[in-house]
From Swiss-Prot:
Location(s) in or outside the cell: Nucleus
Protein name: Ninja-family protein 4
Species per Swiss-Prot/TrEMBL record: Zea mays
A Pfam family hit: NLS_NINJA_AFP
Record GO biological process: negative regulation of DNA-templated transcription; signal transduction
């Protein structure tokens, strides 16, 4: 049978006092040895720094004037090489080592743009000279004609003239368009289906324009653009101021261009 556990544990034995004292002494000795090593390391670092500073000062003091002049000449030559490299770099002749040609092109373009920014006066002078040369032209109309006339090739004008037709047809279209703007959709569609006509070869030389409303065998009706009235061919010719004509259809010409 197990005996019950007592409420408090009693200490049966302990280390002797001599052993505890010796352990504390060893720990203190270790700490002292570590601190001494750290101090030695710090002293060595300080001595090295002082020795390097002394050596550099001695070398500077021991140099002769000739050696000092040689060093200054080396510095000046290095500065000159840097300046020449910058000039060649700005002119686009300098190529950076280790870069492909496309990057070389971008570098030269950036250099040229920076050079233009640094020299705005030259660009401004060129602009002022161009303005002065343009101001010496006799008149603005002549200058515009001299500039715009050669800019348009003759071949580009051929299809334009072919599509527009003659000046007479253009005038018919212009007047018909002005009249069509004031009409409704139904009237505009009717006008698009009707060909344009105009008088020609009259004794008085007058010209009247209209639309061919009806052109059946038995009846021909023409709408006058001037007043919008429906007229027969003879009335249309009389409306032009030529009076009565034996054959009025000979003096009425149908336009080839489509109406609006």
């Amino acid at each position: 049978m197990w005996s019950p556990i007592p409420g408090t544990l009693m200490r049966t034995s302990s280390l002797p006092a001599v052993i505890e004292a010796s352990g504390n002494d060893d720990w203190k000795k270790r700490k002292e040895a570590q601190s001494l090593k750290r101090l030695e390391v710090k002293k060595k670092r300080i001595e090295r720094r002082n020795s390097l500073a002394c050596n550099t000062s001695k070398e500077a003091a021991g140099q002769s004037p000739k050696e000092m002049n040689a060093n200054t000449d080396k510095l000046v030559s290095s500065d000159e090489t840097i300046v020449s490299a910058n000039e060649s770099h700005s002119s686009g002749k300098h190529l950076v080592k280790g870069l492909p040609p496309k990057y070389q092109a971008t570098i030269t373009s950036e250099d040229s743009s920076s050079a233009m920014r640094k020299k705005p006066n030259s660009a401004f002078k060129a602009i002022t000279e161009e303005q002065n040369s343009s101001s010496s032209v006799p008149s603005s109309g002549e200058a515009i004609s001299s500039v715009t006339a050669p800019s348009l090739p003759l071949l580009s004008l051929v299809p334009i003239t072919a599509t527009l037709g003659s000046r007479e047809d253009q005038s018919i279209l212009g007047r018909a368009g002005a009249r069509a703007n004031g009409m409704g959709d139904v009237e505009r569609r009717m006008m698009q289906e009707m060909p344009g006509v105009f008088t020609k070869g009259l004794s008085n030389g007058s010209r009247v324009e209209g639309f061919l409303y009806k052109y059946s065998k038995g009846e021909v009706r023409i709408v006058c653009i001037c007043h919008g009235s429906f007229l027969t061919p003879s009335e249309f010719v009389e409306h032009a101021g030529a009076g009565k004509v034996d054959n009025p259809l000979r003096h009425i010409v149908v336009s080839a261009t489509p109406n609006l």
